[in-house]
């Protein structure tokens, strides 16, 4: 039985407003979660509107399946494959907006059995979809020390990555870790300098989670796919929660807003320039949560919403 863990949707109104909803439009919520954004989108759609929601978490799928609305459909899978889902429905180039709320959700963090949190002891899993792929425990038991260190440094920006990786490998040789508490204790013991404002396992848990779920690759693929999926004037509305996610989104929107970069002085005909194409997106700026939202939901503090619009190029 699935427990009802509370989830407060971050930047709810702002993210949906960023889609510039048309009553008869077709929209994608690529991260259904507990349905906060989807329900608000549906409330703004008319009878002809459609909403396609995606999530790879079986618990989110169970929540979505309880929505009995003919305008709504749910897909169990990664949002990186959104171009395939759209093509299967013959909607390529017809999508009016895509919303992505990146990272781990509050219900996933709060449910000890999911293994995302160092604050609650549970199985060392961390998979967004527990039915697919390697768990965190399985990966840490089989990975090379150098690979673990690279993951901690790259995806957790952990300055003690090598020390922690060595401690993880040594501990797994003695007794394989299967619990979140075990990993948190190993990391804490291997960290020589503690940050009084942050648990020593914070960066390690973030890095392992990102690696196990291929989160950054998922984001990059979804962003690339959005260009073929969106109709001219269609919107991208994306919420990020840490610098690694936001960096990818920011870079993508900036590059697609600039168009092809041709070196100065390179001789090109008008036909060649036209073939290169123009700007794919128009960046519409970013928003951050206000003081009131952060006070009511501290997890919103690090969130950033970026919005862009598909051009006619």
Curated annotation (Swiss-Prot):
Location in or out of the cell: Cytoplasm
An example Gene Ontology CC term for this record: cytoplasm
SUPFAM superfamilies (UniProt xref): Putative methyltransferase TM0872, insert domain, S-adenosyl-L-methionine-dependent methyltransferases
Binding of S-adenosyl-L-methionine, residues: 35-37, 55, 79, 101, 108
GO molecular function: rRNA (cytosine-N4-)-methyltransferase activity
Function description: Specifically methylates the N4 position of cytidine in position 1402 (C1402) of 16S rRNA.
Family: Belongs to the methyltransferase superfamily. RsmH family.
Protein name: Ribosomal RNA small subunit methyltransferase H
Organism: Salmonella paratyphi A (strain AKU_12601)
